[in-house]
Amino acid sequence: MADIIKVEHLSYIYNPGMPNAVTALDDVSFTVEEGDFVGIIGATGSGKSTLITHMNGLNKPTSGKIYIDGRDLWAEPEKIRDFRFLTGLVFQYPEYQLFEETCYKDIAFGPKNMGLDEAEIDKRVHEAAAFVGLDEALLERSPFELSGGQKRRVAVAGVMAMKPRILVLDEPAAGLDPEGRDEILSEVKEYHKKTGTTVLLVSHSMEDIAKYANRVLVMSNKKIAMYDTVEKVFARAPELLELGLSVPQVTKIFLKLREMGVDVPADVYTIPYAVKTILAAKARRDAGESLVLPRDAENGKGGVSGC
């Protein structure tokens, strides 16, 4: 797949040239293939939110370049509005941005500003509402009468209705209960699968990143510390912990097993993968194979009796 995002040596300074100047991004370079689902993680202040606001031109690089679909984002500043239809950005607590009289009008706001005809707008509103699991009976109600989770759905649907080729979400499940969190993120994943939209998801939840993303970008001290597949990034758990981050709970369990000398992989990061790995280990043991990790294996600390 071709790269839909290419970032070259991006740096960004707040208040440049002033005594209170602050570097928010420092020489950041990476690419994203079209159709990828990239999780972005990092400690508070690492540069995550500043990075994603560059993806649709809300911030202009102090230095470096950003290419969206092969085009320099800032080559023609007067055309920056066109890129904002290509890259949809959902901020934290997007329901605070709701303002229209009805949910329908709020979802239709973006498509209307794209200059689409009424039939296409109506089609997009209903499609987006369906993607986020919003009951059509709610479309004519005021968004301010809805629950927090329903408001969040309206806000996300408003971005989806513009059919961006890139969907960027900054903690879209923040503040929701576990059930609401799973519903929102599952709907985003389903949207990604059905439309092929490239997704960038900022999250503090390692479980969410492990479950939904196929690649992970790790920010630390305004730079990219890691950028690889989910498997390879979470296999580097000790390095993530050194950066002040965590790993999925199931990964911690398997790392502990390796510390105890049990021969299991270090890159187990989801429950289904854990179940598959445990069943495979049981089959090996039932076949008479030892599950003792060799002493010279990475993270190994000798054997365990009874394995």
Residue ranges, per PLM feature:
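Helix-to-loop junction immediately C-terminal to a conserved catalytic motif
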Residues: N56
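ABC ATPase NBD Q-loop/coupling interface
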Residues: K65-D82
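Conserved ABC ATPase "signature" region
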Residues: A119-A137
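Conserved ABC ATPase signature
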Residues: S142-L146, Q150
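Conserved catalytic motifs of ABC-family nucleotide-binding domains
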Residues: K163
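Catalytic Walker B motif of ABC-type/P-loop ATPase nucleotide-binding domains
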Residues: L167-D170
